[in-house]
A protein has these predicted regions:
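Acidic/glycine-enriched connector segments
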Residues: 1-172
């Protein structure tokens, strides 16, 4: 997980390359492929012979509306084409809502809930969470990197519970 706008892109790039080089044999990266950190990490994972699985926070056509620049959307589509598997997170309260309730970019609570559900999915199904961000958890946005970090902290606090799955290590 990470910020869409990486302030120190070169440092993030180096950290990612070091992470993948030190991780042993290739494995699987789960990623939302969002602009910024997600796409950077996915590219380096693919260069390092890892499989990448795209975990989209909503149906593809809706998610593509969140890419603000044509170049970012093209990069997303190119990475998506290289993914081993694509999973779309079901719409929150799908019984009560249809696709049109989230049809405008940044449509408040519903869209935020989809990003929050993506964060929950990643925390539940990953063993190591790589965070590229500024470290500020003072005002977490729903589904944002700071909130995902807080979810990771909660999962780590429960890691001795045999019923607990998910994140065992956080790197940032």
């Amino acid at each position: 997980s990470g910020h869409r706008r990486l302030g120190q892109r070169a440092m993030a790039n180096l950290k990612c390359k070091n992470f993948f080089a030190a991780s042993g044999p290739p494995s699987v990266l789960l990623s939302g492929l969002a602009e910024g950190a997600d796409q950077l990490v996915a590219e380096i994972a693919l260069e390092s012979s890892w499989r990448v699985e795209a975990i989209l926070p909503m149906p593809l056509a809706e998610y593509e509306k969140d890419f603000t620049y044509a170049a970012a959307l093209a990069r997303f589509r190119a990475l998506l084409a290289r993914c081993h598997r694509i999973i779309e997170i079901p719409l929150a309260s799908a019984v009560d809502r249809d696709i049109h309730t989230i049809s405008t970019p940044r449509d408040g609570v519903t869209r935020e809930q989809q990003y929050r559900n993506l964060g929950r999915y990643l925390v539940e199904y990953t063993q190591t969470m790589l965070l590229l961000w500024d470290g500020d958890v003072s005002a977490p946005k729903p589904g944002g990197t700071a909130e995902v970090k807080l979810m990771c902290d909660a999962a780590l606090a429960r890691q001795d519970d045999p019923e607990c799955h998910g994140v065992r290590r956080v790197i940032h």
